[in-house]
Each structure stands twice: as structure tokens, then as C-alpha cells.
Design a protein with these regions (language model features):
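Conserved N-terminal beta1-alpha1 strand-loop-helix module at the mouth
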Residues: 1-163
Length: 163
């Protein structure tokens, strides 16, 4: 069951577990009983209204909000000002790193993931080497095709702002 999966993941010592609140996703969080006891709860949203994000945050006691759509800095500012902890960003090319500066101070973390035309996880491996060019003040998390074969590279990845 989903609850068993969450407990098993939590037993691995993870810091955060993401829950999808995007209706078009094949995996959508619907039951508060399935939430982790210790790991931080991250709600993943795609172009969702502020009102719905606030409602889900309250209902599921979310610790972080991951924005995975086309959210503008002004929108992130309104969520940040409402007291929400934000995680956001997808990049494709080195030049995409330049656009993150507009979000400085609005996101608690950036999640650098592979940018694709569709929303959600593509399974495409993200080129973490692009991040050696990142020198912003916001710490970041990695995503993008993480699997058992990439764990070694993930553990070896070093950057002063890698959380």
C-alpha cells in the first residue's frame, strides 16, 4: 500500500517525502493517514491556485511546497509572504541558471530538475555538472532521473550550496 511504501522510505532516513497534488498525475495524494511521521512533508503542485495550496497545506500539514509549473516570482512572493516554505525550479541549459536570481529570497530551496515540455518527473537524468556554474545564495536539492544507478554519483556530487 502507499502507507507501507511511505513507512519503508522513511525507514531509509530520508529528510523529505514528496506528495503529488496535481490531478493529471497518475499518483495523487488523497489520504492524510498515508503521511510520514518523521520526514518533512513536501506538497508538489503544478500551476495551482494559492487558495488550494493553502488548503492542502493545512489539511495535510505540509512542511514545504514544491512548485513544478510556470510560477512567476510574484506568485512565489505571495506564497512566501503567507508563511509557506518553497522549493522550485527546473532548468535545461546553463543559461537557465541566470533566471533563478529573480527567485532569491522567495524560495527556501531550489530543486534543480530536468526541464521537459510536460509536467512531472520525466525520468530523464539531469546534468548535475551544470550546477558548478551556480553561485547564488539559495541552497539546492537535486532531482532528475535519480535511480539506483545514479546514487553513487549523487553521493559524490559536491557543491557549497548543495543541501
Amino acid at each position: 500500500t502507499e502507507a507501507e511504501n511511505i513507512r519503508n522510505v522513511e525507514l531509509q532516513g530520508v529528510d523529505m517525502i514528496g506528495f503529488i497534488f496535481y490531478p493529471k498525475s497518475p499518483v495523487v495524494c488523497a489520504d492524510a493517514r498515508d503521511l510520514p511521521a518523521c520526514a518533512k512533508r513536501v506538497g508538489v503542485f503544478v500551476n495551482e491556485s494559492k487558495e488550494n495550496i493553502l488548503m492542502y497545506t493545512d489539511r495535510f500539514s505540509l512542511d514545504y511546497i514544491q512548485l513544478h509549473g510556470n510560477e512567476a516570482p510574484e506568485y512565489c512572493r505571495s506564497l512566501h509572504n503567507a508563511g509557506l516554505h518553497l522549493i522550485s525550479f527546473s532548468i535545461l541549459l546553463p543559461k537557465d541558471l541566470l533566471s533563478v536570481s529573480a527567485y532569491n529570497g522567495l524560495c527556501d530551496y531550489y530543486l534543480f530538475d530536468t526541464k521537459t515540455p510536460q509536467y512531472g518527473g520525466s525520468g530523464n537524468q539531469f546534468d548535475w555538472n551544470l550546477l558548478h556554474r551556480y553561485n547564488g545564495p539559495t541552497p539546492f536539492l537535486l532531482s532528475g532521473g535519480i535511480n539506483p544507478y545514479s546514487v553513487k554519483a549523487l553521493r559524490e556530487f559536491r557543491h557549497p550550496y548543495f543541501a
